[in-house]
Regions:
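Hydrophobic helical h-region of N-terminal Sec-dependent signal peptides
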Residues: 13-18
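Sec/Tat signal peptide C-region and signal peptidase I cleavage site
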Residues: 21-27
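Bacterial N-terminal signal peptides that target proteins for export
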Residues: 2-12
Length: 167
């Protein structure tokens, strides 16, 4: 009888472990907001800027010296954004790209501040069917500067997945 009880206990324990692992696997991925990537003091400064007068001579503030939020290093999650291709392969896949918070960023001058651009170099190039669409970019954030002719980023991401955004 003792053998049967031990086997039953092992079976129940194994089932509980399996259920626990399934719950972890199905857990909601942490959402990352673009404002989380801006240090509070810089965000406060940005919010205190006057409304732009489009009829006058606009002088855009220079945010090129923006800083990353150090506590975001190593955060795993997903962020919505637009993909700006940096390198496109012969197969028409993207092997390097920036993720930006709004459509047209990096194409227009000036680009967003570096702490509002995430550099991604996936292990395998990704296929893009809708370059104008928003996507969920999921992975692990790292503090890492990358610069090229399209812009400069303060963050990079170890990519887990890219999926179409559904709001």
């Amino acid at each position: 009888m003792k053998f049967a009880g031990t086997s039953l206990w092992r079976l129940v324990f194994g089932a509980l472990v399996w259920v626990g692992l399934q719950s972890v696997a199905m857990a909601e991925v942490r959402g990352i907001d673009w404002l989380e990537l801006i240090p509070p003091e810089e965000l406060k400064e940005m919010e205190s800027q006057p409304i732009v007068d489009h009829n006058g001579t606009p002088i855009a503030p220079d945010y090129s010296n923006s800083h990353p939020v150090l506590t975001m290093n190593g955060v795993e999650g997903r962020i919505p954004g637009y993909i700006v291709p940096i390198t496109v392969t012969e197969e028409n896949t993207i092997s390097e790209f920036f993720v930006v918070p709004y459509f047209g960023a990096c194409i227009h001058v000036p680009p967003p501040p570096p702490n509002q651009i995430i550099y991604v170099k996936p292990e395998k190039p990704i296929e893009m069917t809708e370059i104008w669409a928003a996507y969920w970019i999921e992975g692990k954030l790292k503090l890492e500067n990358q610069a090229n002719s399209l812009g400069q980023s303060s963050y990079s991401m170890e990519l887990t997945s890219v999926t179409p955004w559904e709001g």
